[in-house]
Amino acid sequence: ISDRFHFPGFQKGKQVYEMLKASDVYIMPSVSEPFGISPLEAMQMGVPSIISKQSGCAEILNHVIKTDFWDIDAMADAIYSIITYPAMHKQLKEEGLKEVNQIVWKKAGKKVIDIYNNLLNK
């Protein structure tokens, strides 16, 4: 599979974005990831993403494909679908970019403040 997949190991700075620019699909099959930022980086670069349902970011991301980390058949199907169906690739790319551009610290902070205010008012 080495002729079709890249396993670059640790990347930093520009290397990350250069690798993402050259990618058709980003996959994060983590068993446990409190909140991986790498799918957001991929989405920011317009790369459709596949993440595990068990990752923390699965709770907030909608325009990704989510699979169980142990279900390699579902993961393979997701990869195949993104590569084979241009409309799916386009939708995940465009909607994912819109979604990730809406994630800003100000909005996240307001949500936390609203939660605390709701709890205090009960």
Segments predicted by a language model, with ranges:
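Aromatic "clamp/platform" in nucleotide-sugar-dependent glycosyltransferases that forms part
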Residues: 31
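Short hydrophobic beta-strand element within catalytic cores of glycosyltransferases
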Residues: 48-51
